């Protein structure tokens, strides 16, 4: 895999991308933030933009399941996993406080540890496995394991398993951040999530306008 693309409409995608980055630090990744428009428009434009960037492998990340063929829920969670689902309560345990922390861009804060401990205490001692069923949870998979490990409960992380199965090739850890609308507060939050400098650039279909073609390469192409 030359490069993995992550397209998203809210900050949930940043947590997913960062989780993958921590699992595969050398993997080249492109993040595309497109906050406006309907989900249908987002999916259609994402496929077009990934084509322009020649990115074959990508995920679309949305807090809820979409009809996208590269939707996180379909691609990552598609296999189905046994265990108590940590989600909205629709299929398992309602962990809405964590969902709010993610949507507010606060999932990296220390108070989340207290929330995890609280959820752990509410889980039956007869539970053998819990599944991190929503996008973003993998960002703190180690903290889930610490909390639920007190009851000897196994934590299943679908994203980690998907990465292990599908992402073998590595690059030099090049991260590219694009947005369709400027939002510097959002950029600051993403920087806090990655804990390293982050600079978004405006997305354009042409690679020159995206800054992906160096001057020397432009000269050679003209000759």
Predicted regions and their residues:
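Non-catalytic structural scaffold of enzyme domains
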Residues: 1-223
